[in-house]
């Protein structure tokens, strides 16, 4: 089993990337792809899924992220695609929520139902609470709460979830809710996003 490769990202389309290492191109699936840029040299940790339903190689920015992916797919009812979707929410955010036992916040992840969220917390909280400091967990959770407040406010104004997520991915996260709302609305307006009642 190949644990990692060092190379360069030569193409990126959504979560699908082409990663060149030692003259060989690898087709990989990378959660939260906004973290990497084309032509960026980096080390990616790999995990290959090969069965009758799927043949794919997932890539991760660090070993702990890969470890969480493996932990997630070991749980009953959570497959590779579901685990990928969870990590796409943001590795640090997910770890902080698991460490705090915050199943309610985990439910905000698209396609993650309450039963799965409670299962993740029940099975993984003890392990992952030891792998993140309380200070870091509190800081990440504060940012997550701010983003949730901004999202809910923008939904009430009439923007779609997809519009909001797209705008928030392009602005800096701060503890100033009003400023983030103003920046998000400005961005969506200038880029001619189509607004509609949620």
Swiss-Prot record:
Disulfide bonds: none annotated. The keyword Signal does not apply. One of its GO terms (cellular component) is cytoplasm. Residues 144-198 are annotated as: Domain III. Keywords: Cytoplasm, DNA damage, DNA recombination, DNA repair, DNA-binding. GO terms for biological process: DNA recombination; DNA repair. Residues 1-61 are annotated as: Domain I. Residues 140-144 are annotated as: Flexible linker. The keyword DNA-binding applies. One of its GO terms (molecular function) is four-way junction helicase activity. Residues 62-139 are annotated as: Domain II. It is found in: Cytoplasm. Gene3D superfamilies: 5' to 3' exonuclease, C-terminal subdomain. Belongs to the RuvA family. The RuvA-RuvB-RuvC complex processes Holliday junction (HJ) DNA during genetic recombination and DNA repair, while the RuvA-RuvB complex plays an important role in the rescue of blocked DNA replication forks via replication fork reversal (RFR). RuvA specifically binds to HJ cruciform DNA, conferring on it an open structure. The RuvB hexamer acts as an ATP-dependent pump, pulling dsDNA into and through the RuvAB complex. HJ branch migration allows RuvC to scan DNA until it finds its consensus sequence, where it cleaves and resolves the cruciform DNA. NCBIfam families: ruvA. Has three domains with a flexible linker between the domains II and III and assumes an 'L' shape. Domain III is highly mobile and contacts RuvB. Homotetramer. Forms an RuvA(8)-RuvB(12)-Holliday junction (HJ) complex. HJ DNA is sandwiched between 2 RuvA tetramers; dsDNA enters through RuvA and exits via RuvB. An RuvB hexamer assembles on each DNA strand where it exits the tetramer. Each RuvB hexamer is contacted by two RuvA subunits (via domain III) on 2 adjacent RuvB subunits; this complex drives branch migration. In the full resolvosome a probable DNA-RuvA(4)-RuvB(12)-RuvC(2) complex forms which resolves the HJ. HAMAP family: DNA_HJ_migration_RuvA. This is Holliday junction branch migration complex subunit RuvA. The gene is ruvA.
